[in-house]
Regions:
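Hydrophobic alpha-helical membrane-associated segments
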Residues: 3-4, 20, 50, 54, ...
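Short helix-capping/hinge motifs at transmembrane helix termini and TM-loop junctions
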Residues: 4-6, 32-34, 106-108, 141-142
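Short helix-terminus and kink motifs of transmembrane alpha helices
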Residues: 6-13, 38, 57-60, 64, ...
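Hydrophobic transmembrane alpha-helices and their membrane-interface caps
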Residues: 10-63, 120
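Pore- and gate-forming transmembrane helices of large, multi-pass membrane proteins
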Residues: 14, 71-106, 116, 122, ...
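Transmembrane alpha-helix detector for multi-pass membrane proteins
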Residues: 41-61, 83, 87, 91-98, ...
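Hydrophobic alpha-helical transmembrane segments of membrane transport and translocation systems
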Residues: 106-161
């Protein structure tokens, strides 16, 4: 979806962020020898969806700013985009984490694995959507030309400021 909706380089960043989230979440379960059951699997799948949604929000802002801020470097555009989405991402993640802490404390023993997986996954997913996906774009040398709309033949294009 991201390769078609945005650009191939964005999809590489998103997949890298998703792999990062899943590996760290499963690593925590392995490190602390926590039982892995179907509820944990459901939580890992939810983490993938949550992280992908965050990554899409950040990627959309990066794409939008590449088209708006034409004279800046890729690093500057990505920095502005991350700054603009940081408050939204942190508030969303913190409210989710508060609910997950309550779920862990009051949810009972059967739901602990689910809550732990989501706690770790949301925390790591927030980090990866901001830092991992954007840095992969920089490593792949994202440029303004990658995101410019194609010019249709015979159509006059207005100059943007």
């Amino acid at each position: 979806y991201i390769a078609f909706r945005f650009q191939f380089k964005f999809s590489v960043g998103a997949v890298s962020a998703l792999a990062h989230d899943v590996i760290i979440t499963l690593g925590v379960f392995s490190l602390f020898e926590i039982d892995f059951d179907l509820t944990v699997l459901a939580a890992v799948l939810a983490v993938i969806g949550y992280s992908l949604n965050d990554t899409i929000v950040v990627s959309d802002r990066i794409r939008e700013n590449f088209r708006k801020i034409r004279k800046e470097s890729a690093v500057a555009v990505i920095n502005v985009s991350l700054t603009e989405t940081l408050a939204r991402t942190l508030v969303t993640s913190l409210t989710t984490l508060l609910v997950l802490v309550a779920l862990f404390i009051f949810g009972g023993e059967l739901i602990h694995g689910f809550a732990i997986a989501l706690l770790v996954g949301v925390f790591v997913g927030t980090y990866s959507s901001i830092y991992v996906a954007a840095n992969v774009l920089l490593l792949m040398n994202i440029a303004k030309e990658d995101l410019m709309l194609p010019v249709k033949e015979g159509v006059e294009v207005d100059e943007l400021p």
